[in-house]
């Protein structure tokens, strides 16, 4: 997913929030479409008291996604996982505070190894071209993204009871609520005007942005549901361990999905 997202952001670096909004709307549309095909997918009723209870998890989700998108836009795709490398250690810390429990020493050792790898990855490298070196702001974006993703993973477990323990209902609330929050930010960032100007330009190929939004929106939706199921069945920390393993395998594979 990261190389595909990066390809779209390279084609439209001035439209990060609009791109994110497109993905969220596609997820909501897919949920509505799936609900017509099978009774197992139920769209929740939009009730104010439920919205208030889910406001923290929805807000943390969209803030994390925004920082995540900004980080990916500003760094090379190969460096993105390093910039976000603190997800696992921060999830362990946040989960520890939230549950008032201490993970095993092996978990802390794993967190220490990952932290050391992160610090090594962001340290200056004289062999790296200046143009390829990540900026300080992009590293900060990555750290903030990691922090909010960690908090979000912990909040998911606590939010499921408000959605009848349904990952589908939580996915719907999360994507719809996030889209509502990011919509005014698109206007404030002037991205509608930017999109109109670029669409009128003969030099800009809008196909990468449009088709990329559709493809990554579909796969992003599937990953969202899979992640919620993983946290529901296991725990935030276990979910992050499995996610890191998958990302490592994906990093070693060629970028053939771009």
Residue ranges and their predicted role:
Residues 1-258:
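Polytopic endomembrane small-metabolite transporters, centered on the Drug/Metabolite Transporter
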